[in-house]
Amino acid sequence: MSYRPILTLLIVTSCAALSAPGAFAQSKGEIRIAHVYSRTGPLEAYGKQTQTGFMLGLDYATGGTMTVAGKKLVVIEKDDQGKPDIGKSLLATAYGDDKADIAVGPTSSGVALAMLPVAEEYRKILLVEPAVADSITGDKWNKYIFRTGRNSSQDAISNAVAIDGDGVSVATLAQDYAFGRDGVKAFKEALKKAKIVHEEYLPQATSDFTAGIQRIVDAMKDKPGKKVILVIWAGATPPYGALAALDLKKRLGIDVATGGNILPAMVSYKQFPGMEGATYYYFGIPKNPVNEWLVANHYSKFKTPPDFFTAGGMSAAIALVEALKKTGGDTATDKLMKTMEGMSFETPKGKMTFRKDDHQAMQSMFHFRVKADPAFAWGVPELVREIKPDEMNVPIRNKR
């Protein structure tokens, strides 16, 4: 299907220094959506993909009209720069001064954790996309928080499916903040047979992995059986190149495994043919009308395929529009919450459902095996099988 280009949406951009109190007067004919994300900072690439997907998703879900129940959708964009204090302040400004009815974001788990209490203070929904840490819908959760993005447990359980086995020794290499630590914790809980022999945590902006990888090698080199390093890493300086340069498989029989990633990061996956893991999204995997629309329209508009976080942004937009359609455009928080709890909606990944217990979107993950295809600059994650929501016992970690 095809819709006319985006013409009718008003976008208001903001940074930390903008958005003076009362700068925007709310109209009854508008639905105001704040999108707080990393337009700059260490996760800039992720944030920009989310924004692209979100705008495409609004276009798709509204049939190109950018309205719901006769009300214009107004998106107020704010750059948190990947900094928790800025994200917290911007969300308060969005709810308070900009009169946002609902907010989406952020990119970083650290920023998200700072923003959660703001949603509770203003009693307005924050739809988290794409921040991953379990604690967002776990011990730090409040009832105003929904999430379309996957959580650490969904990453971990699906990767455990791909890696777990008798006699397998696993070392983890992760960033030393909420995303990395929650990811490792969830992965350890998900393993049934394999044993964790080492956990390595490095600063987010690490570019020299020599010492960290050496500690992993020292812990693993004499272990019998299959040996795997699981990488849990976000941002522009992933360790895959450093791992490939050491040729650990050939020298020491140590495999590398990881989840999906953005296409530029997956260029280094080409050095690991046969590597297995589980991904949230790769444009060539899901076969459904929503993904077909996304791929076709993204190619048409940008001459490239949609990336990992583009799908997440689109999923968040579809969820919002579907909820607003069901309320007849009513943005009252209580009505939206009742509508969204248990709500199912179609996304580029397939069907998602907001679990009533913690508002986490239950969704499929995709077990892949990397193929070095000369037609692509990146290692292609070929589908082994879809891991459906009912196969993953995703823990409920919050308290209501």
Q: Which ranges hold each PLM region?
A:
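Short, charged, surface-exposed loops that flank catalytic or proteolytic processing sites
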Residues: 325-338
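Extracellular/periplasmic periplasmic-binding protein-like sensory domains
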Residues: 240-314, 325-327, 374, 380-400
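Solvent-exposed, acidic/polar segments of extracytosolic/periplasmic ligand-binding ectodomains
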Residues: 31, 273, 341-400
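Glycine-rich, charge-decorated loop segments at or immediately adjacent to ligand/cofactor-binding or catalytic sites
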Residues: 136-143, 208-209, 262-274
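Periplasmic-binding protein-like
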Residues: 94-107, 127-129, 170-174, 223-239, ...
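Beta-alpha junction/loop-to-helix N-cap segments that form part of ligand/metal-binding clefts
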Residues: 30-32, 45-52, 60, 64-138, ...
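Extracellular/periplasmic Venus flytrap/periplasmic-binding protein
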Residues: 86-89, 134-135, 142-246, 284-293
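Short, low-complexity disordered leader/linker segments with a strong preference
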Residues: 1-32, 399-400
